[in-house]
Amino acid sequence: MYQPLLLLPLLLTSAFANPHDPHIHHSLEKRASFPIPSSKGSVTFSSPKTISGTFDGGMKTYGRGVKCTGQDEGGDEDAVFILKDGATLKNAIIGADQIEGVHCEGSCTIENVWWTDVCEDALSLKGSGSGTHKIIGGGARNADDKVIQHNSGGKVIIQDFTVQNFGKLYRACGNCKKQFKRTVKISGVKASSGKALVGINSNYGDTASIKGCATSVKEICVEYEGTNNNSKEPKKKSSGPSSYCKYSEPLSKC
């Protein structure tokens, strides 16, 4: 008659022990890891560094020595790097001690660049041009809102990018005073723990094509009714695959 009572602690011990199984722990740890390269040193700029050609950061961590101000809008003076039209930034880590990350004033290439903690935005694509912006490799995490903010026109190519714990990976500006038709092509993305992967303004003819994997991302592609009134917020129209949001649902899990 005492056997069930004796077995109960053993069953409870077994049940609570399962989450600590080394194979399960390894699986969870692997899924949650952020594959940022090891830093080769740190550099703090007193003002933004302007790049007009190619800058190889040598996998050092770059910052401004300031505290993030959250979603308070900053300006060019708060950026770590400002890229002139046609410039390239590669092999760099953007630290947490900054506000505006990287600004591109025209077409630019961002290759193997990592953001340890995004502040207002990680990358802002500015200017009035209609060229091509390339983001190849690299990654970003801990973005309360946007990772890539696309204010200019043209095309954005995002290839083999890792993003974790974010609001949106890409957002076409919803209320810029000057609006454009914008295109984003995403391939090989690895996304986890996000609100939306992409936000576009379909009323301006924006399109997004998306391939990759996503885990715990609430929405993949959201269409908005954009406006050129900077004092108004764009209205959400729809979410999911369409002639503007081009992808197959569901994306595979990472």
UniProtKB/Swiss-Prot annotation:
Glycans are attached at residue 229. It is found in: Secreted. Optimum temperature is 37 degrees Celsius. Residues 227-254 are annotated as: Disordered. It catalyses: Eliminative cleavage of (1->4)-alpha-D-galacturonan to give oligosaccharides with 4-deoxy-alpha-D-galact-4-enuronosyl groups at their non-reducing ends. Optimum pH is 9.2. InterPro entries: Pectate_lyase_PlyH/PlyE-like, Pectin_lyas_fold, Pectin_lyase_fold/virulence. Its EC number is 4.2.2.2. SUPFAM superfamilies: Pectin lyase-like. GO terms for cellular component: extracellular region. One of its GO terms (biological process) is pectin catabolic process. The keyword Secreted applies. Residues 239-254 have a biased composition (Low complexity). Binds 1 Ca(2+) ion per subunit. Residues 1-17 form the signal peptide. Keywords: Calcium, Carbohydrate metabolism, Cell wall biogenesis/degradation, Glycoprotein, Lyase, Polysaccharide degradation, Secreted, Signal. The keyword Ligase does not apply. Gene3D superfamilies: Single-stranded right-handed beta-helix, Pectin lyase-like. Pfam families: Pectate_lyase (PF03211). GO terms for molecular function: pectate lyase activity. Belongs to the polysaccharide lyase 3 family. PANTHER family: PECTATE LYASE E, PECTATE LYASE F-RELATED. Pectinolytic enzyme consist of four classes of enzymes: pectin lyase, polygalacturonase, pectin methylesterase and rhamnogalacturonase. Among pectinolytic enzymes, pectin lyase is the most important in depolymerization of pectin, since it cleaves internal glycosidic bonds of highly methylated pectins. Favors pectate, the anion, over pectin, the methyl ester. This is Pectate lyase E. It comes from Emericella nidulans (strain FGSC A4 / ATCC 38163 / CBS 112.46 / NRRL 194 / M139) (Aspergillus nidulans).
